[in-house]
């Protein structure tokens, strides 16, 4: 897998589940892009790696840190240079055809990325859903998460992270996204919760379990 994950979401988690299932007992790698800007890529490379490992602990050891890998082509070169002769890439359903065409175009050909030559070419498998890095309003996309962070809506932001990450780390992630977007950090995380005087949600809030996702 090669992804932006800026920020990571439960959609990325589903993609990684498919990756692990597809790999079976074979090794698999997760590469993250290193692009960073204050519009669509607010998180730094190091922050993405850190938070992805917290969000997806099952796959933490497979999340690779390699400053030389900045594109899918770089990732394939690194995998080929490690001795692998065959490779399967897992991607969102809307990216499968694009990856099949572009990545196989350079199979066996040298380029700026280096060289890779996999037997049977690069096989690209659909994760069964659209690319969680895609822009738009479909599903729990990274673009929606950036919007929640911009609005300071921690409730919806946290819902898009899943259950593995702690409340404290979820808050740090939202503030890291805000900072990368050029916004001030926020401490008023619970302003979006409207509680009735007596309710189960109020008791969860008081006991500190409401945001234990």
Task: Locate each region found by the language model.
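Nucleotidyltransferase catalytic core that binds NTPs
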Residues: 1-209
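Short beta-strand-centered aromatic/proline hotspots
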Residues: 213
